[in-house]
C-alpha cells in the first residue's frame, strides 16, 4: 500500500439522514461496498440493522470478510454488479428492503493498488477493470480506432482536447503497445496542458473516460436506479452519491421522471418522455454537496453530490429510455461525434 490516506465515506452525515438511519432496524443494500465505509456506518446506526453489501470487485468482497465475521450475521457480502442488485438481493431470499445507498466512483482501494491500473499517479499495468474478465483499458487504448477513442474521451471524460489525445495515442501505438499507466499519462500530458491553478493532472479526464468505458459505469448506474426502484418497499429510501456531471445528470433525470416530471436525454434525444406514475417523492429537492469543513478534510468530497428519494406505493413503471441514451455514446449520425 502507498501512503495515501484511508478511504473516508463522503457526505456520511447527509447519507445517514437521507436513509433515516437510527430510526429503527431494517435492511439496507450498500450497492457499492468498496472499503465498507457506508456499510460500517449503517450497521453502527442500530444494533438490529442488517446490510446486504454488493461489489463486483472480488478484492473488496475479500477485504470485507473480517467485518462480516464481526457482525455476527448482520452483514451479507455478495459479489456482483450493482446494476443487478434486485436479482442479487432476491437470490438471498429477501423480497424488499428499507434502503439502498450507491456511491458512484472508483474506490480508494482500487486507486491505491498500482497493479489495478486505475491511477496515473502510480505506474502499473493499464487495466482499470473492476473484475477480471472483459476488455481492459490497454485493450481499448491499443485496439480502438482514433474516432472511437476520441468519442469515448470527449463524452465520458468531457475532455475538450479529445481529438488531439486520440491522435497522440494512435501515433504512440505505431512505436509499440501502450501497456502502462505512466506511458498513457505521458502521452496525454504531451497534448493537454494543465489548467492554471486547478491542480488537476492533464490525464485526469482521459483516465476517467477509459475507466467508465471499460466498466460500463454509466450503463450500470442507470440499471442500478431501476433495480433499486424494484426492490425498495413503499417508504424505503434511495440515496445516491455521484462525483461528476455525467453521473449526476443520470440520477437527476431518474428522480425527476419518477417524481412526476417529463424528461429528455438532452439534445441527443429531444422528445421528452411522458411522466409515469410517481414511484418516488424527492427527499432532496436538489443536490447536496459537502460542507466547507468536509471538503477541506477530505479532498475526495469536493465534487460529491447527494440526491435521494423515497419509494411510493405506485406500480413499477417501464424503464426510462432517456437514461439509457444518457449512458451511451451519442451516435455520429446525430452529430455526437463533433469536437
Curated annotation (Swiss-Prot):
Protein name as it appears in the record: Ribosomal RNA small subunit methyltransferase H
Record has rRNA-binding as a keyword: no
Similarity field: Belongs to the methyltransferase superfamily. RsmH family.
Keywords: Cytoplasm, Methyltransferase, rRNA processing, S-adenosyl-L-methionine, Transferase
Record lineage: Bacteria, Pseudomonadati, Pseudomonadota, Alphaproteobacteria, Hyphomicrobiales
Its job: Specifically methylates the N4 position of cytidine in position 1402 (C1402) of 16S rRNA.
Region span, Disordered: 286-319
GO molecular function, one term: rRNA (cytosine-N4-)-methyltransferase activity
Catalytic activity: cytidine(1402) in 16S rRNA + S-adenosyl-L-methionine = N(4)-methylcytidine(1402) in 16S rRNA + S-adenosyl-L-homocysteine + H(+)
